[in-house]
Amino acid sequence: MAIAVVLLVCVGMRRELAAALSVGDCVALASVPITWTAVRKARRFSLLLVLSILASGTAYIMSLLAESSFVVEAWARRVTTLSLLAVPCAVAVFVWGARRLGARRAALAVGFGMFLDALPLLQTSSNPWKFGIGAAVTIMVLSLVADQRRLVQIVALLVLSGVFLVSDSRSTLAFLAIILGTVIWQALASWARWHVPTPRRLAISQILVLAVVGIVAMVGVVMASESGTLGEDAQNRTIAQSSSSAGLLLSARPKLGASWALFQNRPWGYGAGVKPRFEDLWVAKQGMAALGYDPENGYVENFMFGGRIELHSGLMDMWAAASIPGGLLLLLIAGMALAAMMRDLGRLKATPWLFFAALTVVQNVFVGPWTVLPAYLPIVLGAAVLQPPLREAAQLGIDDEPSAPPRDEPTDSAVAPAQQE
């Protein structure tokens, strides 16, 4: 068990070692001989493994072919290709660790690794809670209260929401509001003894409820931001974005304009570590300008295209680095995250830490940088691999009951559910 804890904590750490490789990636890759047995028969894992290998190989080969026309950063090529290979390896670590500790404790260990990784932000960032510490603490707190009464979960979610409210973090606050609304709804449904014949129908019913809760939460956060509740900076940004002709979403994410313009200009992508040429930079700026954003402010040159192509979208970052296989991998990741939440809604007992991590993954697949994703992927994809089929959701109780100690080795019945769906 101690080995499992150490591996899981290390997987949650993204601190760079030599040659710009992260602790998490190195540990995940090195531990494959130990962890492979936990996932070798899991069907949900197979497609993830194949696409990760294909995307990594494509990124490396395209990078080599691009050397005649582009400047290629060797360190960026190495980091990108190995980070793609490390995705299924990190998932294997989580599954292997969860077989021994339970999924909740495995998520807690990864969250603790994320917390250790974010500690330097206390000295380097003006808002460390928003940019790393808050997410790690949220994973840990929600893991700790996952087997507690709903009232305890509601209090924890309210406290976390209050901290994010004063930390100028709109998206995370919206996620917590969605989870809070879901927990309250399930508490009321359980109190009213609401019964749906099958887990599939229950999941569909709760997805509809969740959609309503999500819309209300997002509208509420936008209104709070515009009113100044989230701070003056958030208020100014929201008002400016809402008044733009491109709308709130596109104004808040002008990189989407750059991504679409680059995709139209070069649909097969670039390759890992490739630095854009002047013409690529010009195309990206034109796409951002079309959304009413002024790209002549140094941000595009210094941050988006300073060392490699970074489009603030995991999907488009991996399309640029690994072409179509990279894009398909990210779409698979988003699909697995959504499927994990759907299966969890097959009962009236949502898993808060899974919802928070899955919502974060889905957001960053589409409108967040790839660099944010690796720490969350073991939690979300590992849970997706471990979950039984939706039709068996009604048989589940609370995850990791204290009276049910974790098994040292997975039984055939524990592996079978992941193979059947």
Please describe what each predicted stretch is.
Residues 1-62, 99-105, 143-152, 384-421:
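Transmembrane signal-anchor hairpin modules in multi-pass inner-membrane enzymes, especially those
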Residues 2-5, 141-227, 345:
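Hydrophobic alpha-helical segments of polytopic membrane proteins
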Residues 3-7, 305-313, 317-321, 328-366:
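Loop-to-helix entry and N-terminal half of a specific, functionally important transmembrane alpha helix
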Residues 19-35, 46-64, 68-95, 107-112, ...:
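Aromatic-anchored transmembrane helix interface
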Residues 71-90, 106-150, 160-176, 314-318:
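Membrane-interface segments at transmembrane-helix junctions in multi-pass inner-membrane proteins
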Residues 139-142, 333, 352-408:
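Transmembrane alpha-helices of multi-pass inner-membrane enzymes
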Residues 198-204, 215-258, 264, 273-277, ...:
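Flexible juxtamembrane loops connecting transmembrane helices in multi-pass membrane enzymes
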Residues 241-245, 274-314:
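Interfacial juxtamembrane loops and adjacent helix segments
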